[in-house]
Design a protein with these regions (language model features):
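Walker A/P-loop
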Residues: 31-52
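Conserved segment of the helicase C-terminal RecA-like domain
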Residues: 327-357
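Post-DEXD/H (motif II) to motif III coupling segment of the RecA-like Helicase ATP-binding lobe
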Residues: 129-185
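Conserved interdomain linker/interface between the two RecA-like ATPase lobes of SF2 helicase motors
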Residues: 168-238
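Conserved Walker A/P-loop ATP-binding site and its immediately adjacent core
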Residues: 46-48, 57-80, 241
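Conserved helicase ATPase core of P-loop NTP-dependent helicases/translocases
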Residues: 89-99, 245-246, 256-294
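Conserved pre-motif I regulatory segment
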Residues: 2-38
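A short beta-strand element within the Helicase C-terminal
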Residues: 119-120, 289-314, 320-327, 337-342
């Protein structure tokens, strides 16, 4: 089993941190046929997969890279060609359908329908999005190697299908080493989620959109952005397509070039997300400043000069929160930080996204409680009532503005006011 993953020379020079991750992954998959690689935003998980694929090709092995979205199929295919990997694409009626080639980039939906192919290694990109079709492919190929890739493999029950977790470098270490941008978070003191029900561990979408998609709050969100992030390239996460469109109109009304993007932007009678892909490319090329989406941009979105992430919605999901913040953390020359505007009170509810620990995959039984115990900080951050900076629990004097509040009970504030969140002070 182990000879498939020997440390052969590669043509592309990896960064030292990528070499470390690749070596750790090799060590794990030598003894586990079903492994999940947990690697943070911007670490080049696709590039690491490419190195494994190049080694496998030398041993005449067939490889399949599986994506759950069409734009990720196109993005991965482009990366493979840039690295000299000739491949086919199995996705709808894609023009690059060359099934005889030993490497294929596939959409999980199409592959499941045409699962007559024989591969030695499967890569599941963004494995936190784990469909029944993924399970079907696993079941139909018991002798193959499977490598899941994710920055946030927190999906309940994932450990029932994968036996090992490879987690070489925590996100906090990546920020300390300046591999990722540092971040500050501004968040609201209160938000009214009264009556918003919880379904499958997160807020019910219809209820959430009704609570959040209000003209006053929409205006507050744009006002706050103008005050704190006017010159920053920005991603906004909304509660629904209608909410996205209202936010877009509000930004445009203020003279800010903004566009909303959603999963329905397909050219008529085709599977290709031409409309959505064009919007992403225009955003990448600075044709407009603010892009707005529900969940379409939480995974596989690699525009590195984003320096502001706005949560115009709320969530109880650590995975969604970490994914969203991660969209703004990729390293980019000339940018040192990312500003997070948390209008949903997420940070005060869950904690800072670089403080969650993850020690094993959730098998739906014991792992769930163990990970949650490790993930959630004992004390949660609070907002400075003076400057909006979110500070850690236990920190009284604000490191941003120097304000030290008196000990008083809850203070009412308007739902649009943001407060900078601060981290917990270390005991001497």
């Amino acid at each position: 089993m182990s000879n498939l993953f020997e440390n052969n020379p590669t043509e592309v020079e990896l960064y030292p941190i990528q070499e470390h991750i690749l070596n750790e992954l090799r060590n794990t998959i030598r003894y586990n046929k079903r492994t999940v690689l947990m690697a943070g935003t911007g670490l080049g998980k696709t590039q690491i997969a490419i190195q494994i694929i190049k080694q496998a090709l030398k041993k005449e092995k067939r490889c399949c890279f599986v994506c759950h979205r069409i734009n990720l199929v196109e993005q991965t295919s482009r990366a493979f060609y840039l690295q000299g990997i000739h491949h086919g694409v199995i996705q709808g009626n894609h023009p690059d359908y060359f099934p005889h080639r030993p490497v294929q980039v596939c959409s999980v939906q199409t592959l499941a329908k045409r699962d007559q192919y024989d591969f030695d290694i499967y890569f599941f990109d963004e494995i936190q999005v784990f469909f029944k079709t993924h399970k079907q492919i696993l079941k139909n190929n018991p002798d193959a190697f499977f490598i899941g890739l994710s920055a946030t493999p927190f999906t309940p029950g994932l450990g029932q299908y994968f036996t090992a977790l490879c987690h070489p470098v925590p996100i906090k270490e990546l920020i300390q080493k300046k591999i990722l941008k540092r971040f500050d978070i501004y968040g609201p003191n209160t938000i009214d989620l009264t009556g918003v029900r919880t379904v499958a561990g997160d807020y019910k979408k219809d209820d959430l959109e009704k609570a959040v998609d209000k003209p006053k709050l929409t205006a507050d969100i744009v006002d706050t952005w103008l005050r704190l992030a006017r010159d920053r390239k920005t991603i906004v996460f909304s509660s629904g397509v209608g909410h996205s469109r209202h936010l877009e109109k509000e930004f445009l009304k203020r003279g800010i070039k903004a566009k909303e993007i959603n999963g329905y932007m397909r050219k008529e009678n085709t599977e290709y997300d031409i409309g959505a892909n064009q919007i992403i490319e225009d955003f990448r090329n600075n044709e407009f400043q603010v892009i707005i989406s529900v969940e379409m941009l939480v995974a596989g979105f690699d525009v590195t000069d984003v320096s502001c992430v706005v949560f115009a919605t709320s969530t109880k999901s650590i995975m969604k929160f970490c994914q969203g913040v991660g969209r703004g953390l990729r390293k980019h020359e000339g940018l040192e930080d990312c500003l997070v505007l948390d209008h949903g009170g997420i940070t005060e509810r869950l904690g800072f996204p670089d403080e969650f620990e993850f020690i094993q995959l959730d098998d739906g039984k014991h792992a769930e409680s163990k990970n949650k115990q490790q993930e959630k900080p004992e004390q949660l951050p609070k907002a400075c009532p003076s400057c909006d900076f979110i500070k850690p629990a236990g920190v009284q004097k604000c490191p941003a503005c120097g304000f030290k509040p008196e000990f008083v009970k809850d203070v009412e504030v308007s739902e649009g006011e943001l407060k900078k969140l601060q981290r917990k002070a270390k005991k001497e």
